[in-house]
Regions:
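Structured-RNA-binding interfaces characteristic of tRNA pseudouridine synthases
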Residues: 1-276
């Protein structure tokens, strides 16, 4: 059995997220169909993370097990011939059996794009959040720096991450079983501290202006559900003056989702890279 590492880029606008879902178009489900068409195997690819509906990826990492002898270079070409243009396989390589796209990751980087111009082109609109209204960007820069380091990010998680993870894992196994898919997604008996709590380490959190775009870059050892978009939503409230820079520290300490701002739209978010 071969364990392959794929690097994917995709336009999340066309999909209901990464994870396979009944009667909805997903990135994972589309990849399942492409692999079955190519190899005749029913296998469930595992991503480094489950991007939500509308979230894009420049370099999502995927592991997939297969008995197919197709060389990796040929596999890339063949999959790209089958997949829709909104998904591209950028690279593929053989990995040892223990390598797993999610569990082996040590860091991820996301970027969030806000378009600040008065008029947003329709060709750009699906890849940014258009916000032409006044913002104090200097305060947003200050606020972003406060989340660097190790913190409990419960206030910025959509739901209890542990409960959600268990539910998603159960759903994944159920769907895989119903579809007769082979998967290497079984969790190890001993879960790491990172998987058991809401504490994450953020190595970089910064806003930068590039012409008419305000771009937030965040790199960390892991992210909770909606964490990046909830951070962005809160930083936007700081920029608008509804929250102060000091409020961000207070929100972190409260460990209460209701203390933070609304979730920013999915369109501006990109998974940029995954490190191993």
């Amino acid at each position: 059995m071969r364990n392959l590492k794929l690097t994917l880029a995709y336009d999340g606008h066309d999909f209901a997220g990464w994870q396979v879902q009944p009667d909805r178009l997903s990135v994972q489900g589309t990849l399942v169909s492409a692999f079955e068409h190519l190899t005749g195997e029913k296998t469930l690819p595992q991503g480094s993370g489950r991007t939500d509906a509308g979230v894009h990826a420049l370099a999502q990492i995927v592991t997939v097990t297969t008995n197919s002898p197709i060389p990796v270079d040929n596999l890339i070409r063949a999959l790209n011939d089958i997949l829709p243009r909104s998904i591209r396989v950028l690279a593929a390589e053989e990995m040892p059996p223990e390598f797993h796209a999610r569990r082996s990751a040590v860091a991820k980087t996301y970027r969030y794009h806000i378009y600040r111009g008065a008029i947003c082109s329709p060709f750009q609109a699906r890849y940014v959040y258009h916000h032409p209204y006044p913002l104090d960007e200097s305060r947003m820069i200050e606020a972003a720096a406060l989340v660097e380091g190790e913190h409990d990010f419960t206030s910025f998680a959509a739901v209890d991450p542990e409960k959600r993870k268990e539910t998603l894992a159960a759903d994944q196994e159920t769907l895989a079983a119903k579809a007769g898919l082979q998967t290497n997604s079984a969790e190890p008996a001993h879960k790491s501290g990172l998987e058991r709590n809401n504490v994450r380490t953020i190595f970089l959190s910064q806003w930068q202006r590039h012409d008419d775009e305000l771009i937030y870059t965040v790199r960390g050892n892991g992210f909770l559900h909606h964490m990046v978009r909830n951070l962005v939503g809160t930083f936007l409230m700081v920029g608008k003056g509804s929250l102060t820079v000091a409020d961000v520290r207070r929100i972190l300490e409260l460990r209460d989702r209701s203390a933070a701002a609304a979730t920013a739209p999915a369109s501006g978010l990109f998974l940029v890279s995954v490190e191993y």
